[in-house]
Amino acid sequence: MSKPIQMERGVKYRDADKMALIPIKTVVTERQELLRKPEWMKIKLPADSSRIQGIKAAMRKNGLHSVCEEASCPNLSECFNHGTATFMILGAICTRRCPFCDVAHGRPVTPDANEPEKLAQTIKDMGLRYVVITSVDRDDLRDGGAQHFADCISAIRAKNPTIKIETLVPDFRGRMDRALDILTVTPPDVFNHNLENVPRVYRQVRPGANYEWSLKLLERFKEAHPDIPTKSGLMVGLGETNAEIVEVMRDLRRHGVTMLTLGQYLQPSRHHLPVQRYVSPAEFDEMKAEAMAMGFTHAACGPFVRSSYHADLQAKGLEVK
């Protein structure tokens, strides 16, 4: 029997190294096996990248992270060029090892106690009016990182009194009661937690997560804060069917979720789960129509949609696709 790999604290495991640590089998995708990207998935890069470099410099200066960079988001250039970013707190090393995600896995370091103040000042310097705060999973912390979220919310509001804050939280596995007790005292303006995909493929896509647990987290926050929008999203193209997506949408509505995002999964590297299909813009439009008919107050559905993509516009109920 082989000995378990001893991970050094603070070291990032990515791509092949990360996949080797996953308890499910993943197969490297050969070039000839890759699905050809359709025309609607082609991205145009901005001619001027000075704003992009400015945001990256501000992040580096303050030791901050963006999920845009860490997760290799396809919208990075567009969002950074418009002066928006989704900040990722609690470090850049995740205790989970989902095979769809490009965020590094490993043993995280102790959270930076100064991060809330640095984050708040950076947001003020950038002049942001709407901000999304997310994090890696921190199963090593007794509250899953909930207090750090609360500290960040408080610090941001102290320096930016009129700002709107959306949190994209992990599932706080095994720590839901403690986490919700903390977040109830300092709630965000929008509470977001992504289901990511349909329950049939959870073991393959989200090892270590539980579909019902995630639904319960969303439901319990909504019960505690009925006037605060709750939000969730899925990435499609991982083997699910459109009918299964619609059923997940029904589950979300049954658990009080009011905002929805649906976007196309893109394989970060050939070591990650492969794209099994590209969903057409017309199909996304049909799913949006279904969502609105179910009673969602807002549904952003399109190939490049991500949960924080133009999140300020989503919160205002404006169309994003």
Swiss-Prot record:
Binding sites annotated in the UniProt record for [4Fe-4S] cluster 1: 68, 73, 79, 308
Q: Where is the Radical SAM core domain?
A: 80-297
Q: In which pathway does it act?
A: Protein modification; protein lipoylation via endogenous pathway; protein N(6)-(lipoyl)lysine from octanoyl-[acyl-carrier-protein]: step 2/2
The subcellular localization recorded is: Cytoplasm
Reaction(s) catalysed by this chain, per the record, are:
[[Fe-S] cluster scaffold protein carrying a second [4Fe-4S](2+) cluster] + N(6)-octanoyl-L-lysyl-[protein] + 2 oxidized [2Fe-2S]-[ferredoxin] + 2 S-adenosyl-L-methionine + 4 H(+) = [[Fe-S] cluster scaffold protein] + N(6)-[(R)-dihydrolipoyl]-L-lysyl-[protein] + 4 Fe(3+) + 2 hydrogen sulfide + 2 5'-deoxyadenosine + 2 L-methionine + 2 reduced [2Fe-2S]-[ferredoxin]
Cellular compartments per GO CC: cytoplasm
Instruction: Report the PROSITE patterns cross-referenced here.
Output: RADICAL_SAM
Q: Where does [4Fe-4S] cluster 2 bind?
A: 94, 98, 101
Q: How is the cofactor bound?
A: Binds 2 [4Fe-4S] clusters per subunit. One cluster is coordinated with 3 cysteines and an exchangeable S-adenosyl-L-methionine.
* EC number(s) given by UniProt: 2.8.1.8
Which molecular function terms from Gene Ontology are attached? Answer: 4 iron, 4 sulfur cluster binding; lipoate synthase activity; metal ion binding
Cofactor requirements of the protein = [4Fe-4S] cluster
Q: What class of enzyme is it?
A: transferase
Q: Name one Pfam family in it.
A: Radical_SAM
Provide the alphabetized UniProt keywords. 4Fe-4S, Cytoplasm, Iron, Iron-sulfur, Metal-binding, S-adenosyl-L-methionine, Transferase
What domain of life?
Answer: Bacteria
Give the family this protein belongs to, as stated in its UniProt record: Belongs to the radical SAM superfamily. Lipoyl synthase family.
- The entry's protein name is Lipoyl synthase
Organism for this UniProt entry: Yersinia enterocolitica serotype O:8 / biotype 1B (strain NCTC 13174 / 8081)
